[in-house]
Design a protein with these regions (language model features):
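Short, Lys/Arg-rich, polar N-terminal cytosolic tail immediately upstream
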Residues: 1-3
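Transmembrane signal-anchor helices characteristic of membrane glycosylation enzymes that use polyprenol
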Residues: 6-70
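Generic alpha-helical transmembrane segments of integral inner-membrane proteins
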Residues: 16, 20, 102, 118, ...
Length: 131
């Protein structure tokens, strides 16, 4: 019984330390990688890839053009059909993208790195709790 309690305490300490590290790294994160951009796009955009837009190449685009790709807009909150449609053309399972889309609904109209970071923290904690 004492060993089990000790294991739970150690696991809780590890989870707290990892969460603190995740948050510190998240605060210091100032850019996103291409795979992160694709994840955000697959979770929010109404087309599979932004480069399939007719005006994508040979045109200078402003910040709003890319924020539309990387964020859920006000009129899209609660709509998950984009995730389903995009995943029909992708090899990855849709559960992560559904979670990401849900999290992105809290930061409507602009890009935020936090929905993905919070999902990763939650998944990591749940994996460790299963151990």
């Amino acid at each position: 019984m004492k060993n089990r309690k000790k294991e739970v305490i150690i696991l809780a300490i590890v989870l707290i330390i990892q969460t603190i590290i995740y948050v510190i790294c998240g605060i210091n994160k100032s850019y996103i990688h291409m795979d992160e951009a694709y994840s955000l796009g697959l979770a929010s955009y109404d087309k599979v890839e932004i480069q399939n837009n007719e005006d994508f190449y040979n045109t200078w685009h402003n910040k709003e053009y890319y924020e539309d790709y990387l964020s859920v807009q006000e009129d899209e909150k609660g709509q998950y059909n984009q995730v389903y449609e995009n995943q029909k053309n992708d090899v990855h399972p849709p559960f992560y993208y559904l979670l990401l889309r849900f999290g992105m609904g809290f930061t409507q109209g602009h890009f935020s790195k936090w929905p993905g970071i919070v999902i990763n923290i939650a998944l990591n904690c749940s994996y460790l709790a299963m151990v």
